[in-house]
């Protein structure tokens, strides 16, 4: 991810029949990536292999810090193996859906999450899940853990 989460820059390598279809869709989505993103991409591709090992270690450390805090607060966590976020089950908190829970979390606890329903073809399938990102500074994760403790009163 090169620590530029959300930039949505990438490439595809595929047979021409597939890349032709990809290009047709891509033309409707964007004309081209902004020049600074292209420059950053070129630099990122030249990084040594150690960068990736260190990045994976940092994410693993952050993941292993956040998940126990989430579990202590009452979430059931789905262990990620290649992402910088964790999906969680919120059914223990008694909210009717993920959107309601996410709004409560921001307003009452001061933490943002992404409603799980936004990741499903059938939103109802994710209505008792939310996603938390752990690609944050350790101090931010510490503060999140502290704030999450307030949720225990909802159990």
What do the predicted segments below correspond to?
Residues 1-155:
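PLP-dependent class I/II
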């Amino acid at each position: 991810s090169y620590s530029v989460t959300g930039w949505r820059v990438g490439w595809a390598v595929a047979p021409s029949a597939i890349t032709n279809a990809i290009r047709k869709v891509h033309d409707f989505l964007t004309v081209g990536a902004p020049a600074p993103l292209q420059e950053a991409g070129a630099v990122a591709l030249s990084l040594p292999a150690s960068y990736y090992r260190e990045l994976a270690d940092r994410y693993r450390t952050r993941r292993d810090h956040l998940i126990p805090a989430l579990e202590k607060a009452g979430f059931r966590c789905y262990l990620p193996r290649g992402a910088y976020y964790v999906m969680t089950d919120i059914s223990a908190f008694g909210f009717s859906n993920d959107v309601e829970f996410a709004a409560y979390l921001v307003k009452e606890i001061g933490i943002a999450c992404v409603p799980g329903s936004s990741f499903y073809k059938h939103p109802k399938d994710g209505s008792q899940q939310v996603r938390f990102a752990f690609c944050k500074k350790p101090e931010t994760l510490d503060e999140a853990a502290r704030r999450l403790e307030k949720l225990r009163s909802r159990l």
